[in-house]
Amino acid sequence: MPRAYEIPFDSDRKLMTTVHKVNDNQYMVYTKGGVDELLARCSKYQINGEVRENLEEYKKKIDEFNDQMAENALRVLAMAYKQIDHMPSKEEMETIEKDLIYIGMVGMIDPPREEAKVAVAKCKSAGIKTVMITGDHKVTAVAIAKELGILEDGEDAITGSQLEAMSQEELVQRVENIRVYARVSPEHKVRIVKAWQAHGEIVAMTGDGVNDAPALKTADIGCAMGIVGTDVAKEAADVILTDDNFATVVSAVEEGRRIYDNIIKAIQFLLSSNVGEVIVLFFAILLTPFLATKFGIPIGLIEPLLPIHILWINLVTDSLPALALAFDPANKDVMKRKPVKASSGIFTKGMTWRIIYQGIMIGLLSLAAFVIGISTPNPPVIEGLTQEQVRVEIGQTMTFIVLAFSELIHVFNIRNNKESIFKTGIGGNKQLFWAIGASAMLMLVILAIPVLRAIFSIPVLPMDRIVETIELVIAPVVIVEIFKLLKINTSKDE
């Protein structure tokens, strides 16, 4: 039968109707949609080709069938029809979905994707609360939510009508325990998003239809479907999922956490290194009278680092590894941590503690290198320099080497603040490996080529001072490993 007219599906009505022409004097009206919504527009029902009255008496049986299907996670679609003798006018179209004859229902299985179950489980372990908002029957929604692991014992599922009866204040109070919303309207979605935001939560909302646009716009992160999503939904969203897969959202969260962690690593590395440099210079100035008296060196010569040393460390030693940390893979526990609160700053208690103690550690080790260097008893003879000047250059060289190489090795400490470097290893980031290798190689070039040694005022070190320098370079790894072992490298909230 040719289709003469169509009333498209509407999320408020939850119905769709088509009018078909049989002949000039006979038209058929077919309606399909939600069981409750359709039954409200039916006055009769049909069994085995026989149309019967008293639909009210039969509704109980229909509801039982509906619940049975819904409990099996089937999406139930009810159908009805009626016959009319003329093509309805536009005015009549508004009332055409009345006095229908109910003919039955069909249950359609729409199994959740396997990756969706895994994604929901990942969200749960990551401290992300997953909420289902659907137009399905409540029983169907509950069955699917339980299968996915969204709804657990003690958590609530409510309908749009129940939500309608709540004030926004009441919804805000209850929202943290509600995991499923069934038979909701577009306005309800906006209310749900705002209720979560009232608790200070960052809310991501997925949607594909025109009616999802307000909620997508209201959410902190609106995610529209790229395949089935409407243009209106895509315009309102911040992110478009090209594969329409919820698991992609979870993967994006994981990648976001990796990027955030790597930014933190780079900041911690740079600041702890800079604190180390400041400590060396500050205490050297503070101790200048003592060091001059103790080792018989003129006060004007007490200088642990030359300007060229500081420039080299800041521009070469620090910058390359800091940039390469951006490519670090995610830590194993990245999706087992609670989300960072929006109000939390980058400088948490744990990070501040690590920057301070690791900076002091690097600084004091470098200062120790300077003191050991200027205490050299029989320094080599260098033409044009006094013994005191040679001892100072040895101290400066040892400080320069310890500061530069200890910072390079310290990068591996920073990659994981909880697990031992011997457990995490030094692999997994080729860019970091090459960055550290390049920085180390450039340092060795300076130490090996006489012309560059002269520019950087670097003498050849006695063998005992070389051994002591290597020991001081390795020391940061040992100290941080002890801190990790004693669980004092992190704060309680990490």
Identify what each model region corresponds to.
Residues M1-Y102, M108, A121, T134-K146, ...:
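Cytosolic catalytic regions of ATP/NTP-dependent phosphoryl-transfer enzymes
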Residues T18, G34, M69, M79, ...:
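Residue-level signature of catalytic and energy-coupling elements of molecular machines
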Residues N25-V29, I128-V131, I178-V180:
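Short active-site oxyanion
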Residues I109-I128:
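Short, acidic loop-to-helix structural element flanking the phosphoryl-transfer center
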Residues E152-M205, A224-K418:
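Membrane-embedded transport module
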Residues D212, T218-I221, A237-D238:
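Active-site-proximal glycine-rich helix-loop-beta segment
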Residues A326, I401-E494:
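C-terminal transmembrane module of polytopic membrane proteins
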